[in-house]
Design a protein with these regions (language model features):
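Surface-exposed aromatic
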Residues: 86, 135, 161
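Low-complexity, intrinsically disordered terminal/linker segments enriched in charged
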Residues: 163-201
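N-terminal export/membrane-targeting signals
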Residues: 1-19
């Protein structure tokens, strides 16, 4: 069940591929409070997951529309690759890495979203940092509780998610360790080629 929720969260994160940050149009309905932002988006996603009258393709499209505005994809790509490696990439390589990285996550996990079975969500108050905010959440299944932590920062006056921890483990840092291993033995082009390969089953 833990792997299911990891799959759902990563599906949310990878719901839209972008190559570079661009200023977004004003949205008067975009929540200014980060607690409200996370709560509103999760409730909307759960509503879609619980709707058995729509097929999987329609479900994914609806989730894309709900959550795609709230993630800082450019920062997520930088953090996943790491400060040591990111500046070494050309602009073209950076854009390609973002696309391949997000597509890899999407391909690996989004099929599992269909396994959702009405687990309970408990939202918790935000933990304020100097320039960021952490918002914890607990997912209750029949036999366990799963701790989820959303990490947010402000981008163009909007709160955006830049990482998610599950049971204390950062999704981005997990990928960084894999990328570090590849780059320690090869080049950036080797990494991009690996990301173009189908993910292991």
């Amino acid at each position: 069940m833990k792997s299911l929720w990891i799959a759902i969260i990563i599906t949310l994160i990878t719901s839209q591929v972008v190559s570079a940050r661009r200023k977004e149009p004003e949205d008067p309905n975009y929540p200014k409070d980060p607690n409200e932002l996370i709560r509103t988006k999760w409730n909307a996603v759960i509503s879609v997951l619980q709707n058995k009258e729509i097929d999987q393709e329609a479900r994914i499209k609806k989730i894309n529309k709900i959550v795609s505005p709230i993630f800082d994809f450019q920062l997520m790509a930088k953090l996943a690759l790491g400060r040591e490696h990111w500046p070494k990439l050309t602009k073209q390589q950076q854009e390609k890495f973002i696309q391949l990285f997000v597509e890899r996550l999407r391909t690996s996990y989004r099929e599992k979203i269909a396994l959702y079975t009405n687990e309970e969500i408990l939202f918790k108050p935000a933990e304020k940092k100097k320039s960021t905010i952490n918002i914890p959440m607990e997912l209750k299944t029949k036999d366990k509780k799963i701790a989820v932590l959303h990490k947010l920062r402000k981008v163009d006056k909007r709160w955006k998610v830049y990482d998610v921890e599950i049971q204390g483990v950062s999704i981005l840092l997990t990928y960084r360790s894999q990328f570090d291993d590849i780059l320690s033995r090869g080049t950036v082009e080797d990494l991009l080629s690996r990301l173009e390969e189908p993910p292991p089953q």
